[in-house]
Amino acid sequence: MGKHYCDYCDVFLTHDSVSVRKAHNSGRNHLQNVREYYQTLEPECIQQVLDTLAQEYDLRGIEKPRDLLQPAGSSFMTFGAGPLSGSSDRAFRSQVPPSRMSMGGGVGGGSDRRGDSRGGSGGYGRYGNNDGSRDQGAPPNYSRPPPQGGPYSRPPPDMMAGGPPGISNGPYPPRGPPLGYGAPLPGAYPSGPPPNMRGPPPPLASNGSHAPHSRTGYGPR
């Protein structure tokens, strides 16, 4: 694939494709070179170029841009003070007809709910502004929480008396362990060792040998 040569910038692009040419033509250096080139031409030459471009749009059945409808030398043209001139967006929007600005279209934004035009991104902000900024304050349908000491700052009258509704106004009974987990009642378990448990070993005799075991398992009789 061959390389594309730009007459305005006097450079060869990496290759000739629609995406590469489009990216180059939208670059800042290319637009500046185009403006400088047309500023050196006479108004008659500029008008001839505009007429040629307008004929191409008519042959292809494409709607012509606004810049082609302006006379040569107009400050609204692309290489004058239009969107490609590098001037401020506010100066460019001031030349837009009022009918377009009042419809909310505008250039880069529209009219917000307060009536003034913004140059923001066009969408609505958090509370309704179309410039993407945030207002100071609450949204329209926001309800404030109840103040301190309001109707919900204290418990109901029955709860303040100390007992739940339907019960005498006394303090709550102390909380104990769950049912079945309290201390065992007296006599619940038999005293003494288990039936088949052997007793402790007998003491040593004077000669160092163990005394004979008893048959009951509880030491000598």
Swiss-Prot record:
Residues 80-221 are annotated as: Disordered. One of its GO terms (biological process) is spliceosomal snRNP assembly. It comes from the Eukaryota. One of its GO terms (molecular function) is mRNA binding. Residues 142-158, 191-204 have a biased composition (Pro residues). Gene3D superfamilies: Classic Zinc Finger. It is found in: Nucleus. SMART domains: ZnF_U1 (SM00451). Keywords: Metal-binding, Nucleus, Ribonucleoprotein, RNA-binding, Zinc, Zinc-finger. A zinc finger (Matrin-type) spans 4-36. Residues 178-190 have a biased composition (Low complexity). PROSITE patterns: ZF_MATRIN (PS50171). One of its GO terms (cellular component) is U2-type prespliceosome. Component of the spliceosomal U1 snRNP, which is essential for recognition of the pre-mRNA 5' splice-site and the subsequent assembly of the spliceosome. U1-C is directly involved in initial 5' splice-site recognition for both constitutive and regulated alternative splicing. The interaction with the 5' splice-site seems to precede base-pairing between the pre-mRNA and the U1 snRNA. Stimulates commitment or early (E) complex formation by stabilizing the base pairing of the 5' end of the U1 snRNA and the 5' splice-site region. This is U1 small nuclear ribonucleoprotein C. It comes from Mycosarcoma maydis.
